């Protein structure tokens, strides 16, 4: 595995009154870490980033604890379970700008710059975070992945409506 690809989680929901990200991160941060690690393995990424609102101090605290626990259990870090696969996740606190909910602005902010959208193309999957191909999903999408793997896609699509399967 190389450091060619990046995996990223947008936990910077900016819509007024939206608390889905906060609820998931406060309740089950390990689901997001697990999914990002699985995706990292699938695409050959060795680094993930979670961009979370600084205004969610409990979510930030629980993410830090979950990351430390995952490292202690060797679920994150170098040579996970002697597999040769290494994957780390770092937190980045959002700067409070609504525009950083846009994926390219979010990546610019993670890189330490002012969060302003980049023109596309190139798209993040081609040239994203730190110039590397990047996959970026929101908290809800990441949190669903372990359950879909565990229960199967039929289980997931049994929720929702005929025209909108799943949790949305």
Regions found by a protein language model. Name each.
Residues 29-42:
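Histidine-anchored nucleotide/phosphate-binding helix
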Residues 6-30:
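Glycine-rich phosphate/pyrophosphate-binding loop regions near the starts of catalytic domains
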Residues 24-25, 33, 55-58:
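Cofactor-cradling patches in redox/metallo enzymes
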Residues 47-54:
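Short internal beta-strands
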Residues 18, 34-37, 47:
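Peripheral, non-cofactor segments flanking catalytic/redox cores
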Residues 1-4:
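Short, small-residue-biased leader/transition segments that mark boundaries at the very start
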Residues 60-168:
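Hydrophobic alpha-helical positions that pack around
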Residues 25, 52, 134:
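Glycine- and other small-residue-rich loops at beta-strand/loop junctions that grip anionic moieties
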């Amino acid at each position: 595995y190389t450091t060619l690809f990046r995996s990223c989680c947008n936990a910077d929901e900016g819509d007024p009154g939206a608390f889905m990200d906060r609820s998931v991160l406060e309740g089950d941060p390990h689901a997001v870490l697990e999914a990002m690690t699985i995706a990292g393995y699938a695409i050959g990424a060795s680094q993930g980033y979670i961009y979370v609102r600084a205004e969610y101090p409990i979510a930030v605290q629980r993410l830090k604890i979950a990351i430390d626990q995952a490292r202690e259990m060797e679920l994150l870090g170098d040579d996970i379970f002697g597999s040769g696969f290494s994957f780390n996740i770092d937190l980045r606190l959002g700067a409070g700008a609504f525009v950083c909910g846009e994926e390219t602005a979010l990546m610019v902010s993670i890189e330490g710059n002012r969060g302003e959208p980049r023109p596309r193309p190139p798209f993040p999957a081609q040239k994203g975070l730190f110039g590397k191909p990047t996959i970026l999903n929101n908290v809800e999408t990441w949190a669903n992945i372990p359950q879909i793997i565990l229960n199967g896609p039929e289980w997931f699509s049994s929720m929702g409506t005929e025209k909108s399967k799943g949790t949305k």
